[in-house]
Amino acid sequence: MSQRSAAVFRETKETSIRLDLVVDGQGLVNVHTGFGMADHVITLAAFWAGFDLTLSCTGDLEIDAHHTVEDVGLCLGQALAEALGERSGIARVGFARVPMDEALADVCIDISGRPWLEWRGDDLLPPVIAGQERDLWREFLKAFASAARMNLHVSFLYGRNGHHLLESAAKGLGLALRQAVRRDRETLLSTKGSLD
């Protein structure tokens, strides 16, 4: 069975990103973006997915974290899409509901070739988390879902602490990814015979 992995390098005037992803890993994760909360969220998602991930990013954090986080999302999605190839034989769908103290989030995905982010309940998030606007996390997942060509639904059900809500969603994303990328059968899981 071939190893599902990918390496991505992206260099722009705003960011420089290098990452290596192994889908069938052991949860060995090393992330350095220069923005601690992004490192934490990405580490949680990759660990709970069982991925091995090495990621380094240098970005224009003197402006804010937007370019860094969005570009990292794009690169992560690109790496996942490349590692999965034609997506033949994967379970394709995954979902998880994860608590973190008082917070609860639902995450559902379909690695269908149809990019979409549905982002609900973000009014529960405080306007600023770790010094950045809450919209940053929607942009991160929008970039990830688009580049990975997946349908991604994140719903914050309840909670008061922004960190806890994001952690709940990050773990949920990881668990949903673990289910969706699982090798399930030899054929493409689609009645139409295509995932685009």
Curated annotation (Swiss-Prot):
Alphabetically ordered keywords of this record: Amino-acid biosynthesis, Cytoplasm, Histidine biosynthesis, Lyase
Source superkingdom: Bacteria
Example GO biological process: L-histidine biosynthetic process
Catalytic activities: D-erythro-1-(imidazol-4-yl)glycerol 3-phosphate = 3-(imidazol-4-yl)-2-oxopropyl phosphate + H2O
Localization per record: Cytoplasm
The keyword Iron-sulfur appears for this protein: no
S-S bonds: none
InterPro entries, per database record: IGPD_sf, ImidazoleglycerolP_deHydtase, ImidazoleglycerP_deHydtase_CS, Ribosomal_Su5_D2-typ_SF
Pathway(s) annotated for this protein in UniProt: Amino-acid biosynthesis; L-histidine biosynthesis; L-histidine from 5-phospho-alpha-D-ribose 1-diphosphate: step 6/9
Source organism: Nitratidesulfovibrio vulgaris (strain DSM 19637 / Miyazaki F) (Desulfovibrio vulgaris)
Main localization of the protein described in the UniProt heading: cytoplasm
A Gene Ontology cellular-component term: cytoplasm
Record-listed E.C. numbers: 4.2.1.19
Family that this chain belongs to: Belongs to the imidazoleglycerol-phosphate dehydratase family.
Alphabetical list of CDD domains matching this protein: IGPD (cd07914)
Any one GO molecular function term: imidazoleglycerol-phosphate dehydratase activity
Protein name from the UniProt record: Imidazoleglycerol-phosphate dehydratase
Annotated HAMAP family: HisB
Class in the EC hierarchy, top level: lyase
